[in-house]
From Swiss-Prot:
The gene is pcp. This is Pyrrolidone-carboxylate peptidase. Removes 5-oxoproline from various penultimate amino acid residues except L-proline. It catalyses: Release of an N-terminal pyroglutamyl group from a polypeptide, the second amino acid generally not being Pro. Belongs to the peptidase C15 family. InterPro entries: Peptidase_C15, Peptidase_C15-like, Peptidase_C15-like_sf, PGP-I_bact-type, PGPEP1_Cys_AS, PGPEP1_Glu_AS. One of its GO terms (biological process) is proteolysis. Gene3D superfamilies: Peptidase C15, pyroglutamyl peptidase I-like. Pfam families: Peptidase_C15. The lineage of its organism: Bacteria, Bacillati, Bacillota, Tissierellia, Tissierellales. The active site is at residues 78, 141, 165. Keywords: Cytoplasm, Hydrolase, Protease, Thiol protease. It comes from the Bacteria.
Length: 213
């Protein structure tokens, strides 16, 4: 199995992005399965385009995108991506679409196709906090999550895609009081445990992961 894992470059005034830094720490093979790593730009359109080019080149079985969700307390595995760009801030090239469709011919939303609950449980088995998330936001992370799901639906039906959000690093919150963080090695270990669950589970497990609000 080939697993393509992407991480974003820094954005929003940050000097580092734990997404790409944690992806870089992943081994080149997990349980005998090839791990292919790629950095993508925090730019509407170009982020998806770069991934599409890599997919065409390496033909992965799984695509896992990783992004920073500063303020979240744990590793969050996304359930759904929605067909809207509504950017609160500009991307790294100054784009700021508001209430625009990601894919004109796409559905309003896609349920992502990774075993999200198995991933969460395997991360937690390593004593790392994790949960299912029901929103990837409306910035670049959701843009990529939806874009990859749409590529799967329209071009690569046997490919599985999904998205993992991670917290800030400790050095990013020195001037952000009461903001959660997680060290880089722990994030990288969580990603490895998530990937193990993807390898081991063609179907998701039946455990609760929902929220009341």
């Amino acid at each position: 199995m080939k697993i393509l894992v992407s991480g974003f470059d820094p954005f929003g005034g940050e000097k580092i992005n734990p997404a790409i830094e944690s992806v870089k720490l992943l081994p080149d093979s997990i349980k005998g399965n090839e791990i292919i790593k790629i950095e993508i730009p925090t730019v509407i359109g170009k982020s998806v385009d770069k991934l599409k080019e890599k997919i065409k080149e390496v033909k992965p079985d799984v695509v896992i995108s990783v992004g920073q969700a500063g303020g979240r307390e744990d590793i969050t595995v996304e359930r759904v991506a929605i067909n809207v760009d509504d950017c609160r801030i500009k991307d790294n090239e100054g784009n700021q679409p508001i209430d625009e469709k990601i894919a004109e011919d796409g559905p309003d939303a896609y349920l992502l196709t990774l075993p999200i609950k198995a991933m969460v449980e395997n991360i937690k088995s390593a004593n790392i906090p994790a949960s299912v998330s029901n929103t990837a936001g409306t910035f670049i992370c959701n843009h990529v999550a939806y874009g990859m799901a749409h590529v799967r639906a329209t071009e690569y039906p046997n490919m599985r895609t999904g998205f993992i959000h991670i917290p800030f690093l400790p050095e990013q919150v020195l001037n952000k009081p009461h903001t959660a963080s997680m060290n880089l090695d722990t994030i990288a270990k969580a990603l490895e445990k998530a990937i193990e669950a993807v390898i081991d589970n063609d179907e998701d497990i039946k455990v609760t992961g929902g929220k009341t609000h």
